[in-house]
Amino acid sequence: DLGAAVVVLDVETAEVRAMIGSPSFFDSRARGQYNAALARRSSGSTLKPFLYALAFDQRVSSPATFLPDVPTPFASYIPENYNRRYQGPVPAGEALAKSLNIPAVRLQRRVGTGRYLDLLQRCGFNSLYRQPQDYGLTLCVGGGEISLLDLAGAYTVFPGLGLWRPPGVLAVAGGDRRSRNRIFSPGAAAAVLEALSTPDHLYRSGVMPRGYYGPSLGYKTGTS
């Protein structure tokens, strides 16, 4: 049986507008009472945007910097792209949009796993509590476990132009005390948002047909 979960957030306030943990709560055969939106699963490639924004802020890279997408051993770890093909030098923004693994692992090595992990924890990924060496260079390609709710909440940092606050589920009497924290510069957040919402990115994936002129849309996949 197929499973699914959905989390919808208001990107301005980070308030949860909808959360669906399973296709049917009353379907016991499909474990319908199991809330998959709160379950921890491999992050796949969904954490790459945070790595790229960090690299842009540290001036390790820019969206136009060419990153080598070639077979590269990192000691005993030899990452591959999902299609096992390589594109040679690729601009960082395009490497993010295409979710290429090798450029991302290269960036993580340059940025530093400890610094990357600290950033993810500041974005609300409390499930990533182990030491940097426990994740190694696989952190950006699925080496950690996160929940869909935490992921949706963290992604509000990009339309928020670098500002993030924890997702809120219930209205709080007396006002909202969830402060907004600066995670990225506005420029780094905007660069990531642009890479994930270009027409070519949307058309190539089939998310939107050519000629679409509706509201702006960005997306990132994560295979686990």
Kindly label every feature range from the protein language model.
Residues 61-116, 160, 164, 175-198, ...:
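Conserved catalytic neighborhood of penicillin-recognizing serine enzymes
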Residues 41, 85-86, 97, 220-224:
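Short Gly/Pro-enriched turn/cap motifs at secondary-structure boundaries
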Residues 11, 26-28, 56-65, 126-129, ...:
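Secondary-structure transition/capping motifs at alpha-helix termini
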Residues 13-14, 35-67, 95, 151-159, ...:
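Active-site SXXK
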Residues 78-81, 112-153:
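Mid-domain, small-residue-enriched loop/turn segments at the edges of structured enzyme/sensor domains
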Residues 5-9, 18-21, 66-68, 140-142:
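Soluble periplasmic/extracytoplasmic beta-strand elements of cell-envelope proteins
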Residues 2-4, 15, 46-47, 62, ...:
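Extracytoplasmic
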Residues 1, 6-10, 19-20, 26-36, ...:
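A penicillin-recognizing enzyme superfamily signal
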